A protein has these predicted regions:
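Serine-esterase "nucleophile elbow" of acetyl-processing enzymes
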Residues: 1-68, 216
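Short, glycine/acidic-rich beta->alpha junctions
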Residues: 41, 69-70, 141-145
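Acidic-and-aromatic substrate-binding clefts and catalytic sites of carbohydrate-active enzymes
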Residues: 63-74, 170
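Alpha-helical cap/lid subdomain in secreted, periplasmic
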Residues: 75-235
Length: 235
């Protein structure tokens, strides 16, 4: 059995065991680039779920990822590797984007600290300033793109479980916009309390330090236990 996991830093288990977001942040694993640090990956919710399923785990999650990257790399995995037995995806916040420049993809976030080529810096600064104004528009657009992605996976009969890591589709809910019938494939996408971050906080888990949004190994194990019955009913 093969379990495929994609997402952002929460699915990459950033800081869960060691204080790194990317493998390359640790000189011992620099060659792994932006992949999850191996010690963090071993305690990730994905690894916990894979162990319970006795499955082979493939993680494509990357810290600071946009949802565009998540969809693109999942498509690429399906094209290159074929169909896994199950997919879990934790969706990132809606403001993030992926830019393609000179054949390389860049993930941009509203934090204003992303590394982009010098020729993109003016565009990036303007983008950060305007990010808040575009948030609702981005949420609506990504709501649609995730629905299309979900529909494709349904057509391919690939069991998949989605959840939101931090942000829910709050603008859509609050403004009475059309909500899709996701069935059991998406955990309460319109409810903030059911996102990974807020659910763990509500259940007494703290981040690894007060300045971080990331949780430790104990929280990842708990989230895996939360996901397991929801995933197994799809298998």
């Amino acid at each position: 059995m093969i379990l495929y996991v994609n997402g952002d830093s929460h699915s990459a288990a950033a800081e869960a065991a060691v204080p790194y977001a990317f493998a390359q942040d640790d000189s011992l694993y620099y060659a792994l680039g932006r992949r999850p640090h191996p010690e963090n990956e071993r305690v990730s919710y994905g690894c916990n779920v894979a162990n319970q399923l006795r499955a082979i785990l493939h993680i494509d999650a990357e810290s600071a990822s946009s949802n565009a990257r998540i969809i693109r790399t999942t498509y690429q995995y399906l094209k290159d590797e074929g169909t896994p037995d199950a997919i879990i995806i934790g969706w990132a916040t809606w403001e993030r984007e992926e830019w393609l420049h000179n054949g390389e993809y860049y993930q941009v976030t509203a934090g204003g600290t992303d590394m982009v080529p010098d020729e993109l810096m003016d565009r990036y600064k303007a983008w950060v300033i305007a990010a808040a104004d575009r948030y609702a528009e981005n949420e609506i657009r990504q709501h649609e793109s995730i629905w299309q992605f979900h529909s494709m996976l349904k057509d391919l009969a690939i069991p998949h479980l989605f959840f939101n890591t931090y942000s829910c589709f709050s603008h859509i809910r609050q403004n009475g916009l059309a909500q899709y019938a996701w069935g059991n494939n998406y955990i309460d996408p319109y409810v903030e309390e059911s996102t990974y971050y807020h659910w763990l906080k509500r259940n007494g888990y703290q981040t690894v330090n007060p300045n971080s949004y990331h949780f430790g190994a104990d929280a990842h194990a708990k989230w895996a236990d939360f996901l397991m019955p929801r995933l197994t009913q799809l298998l």
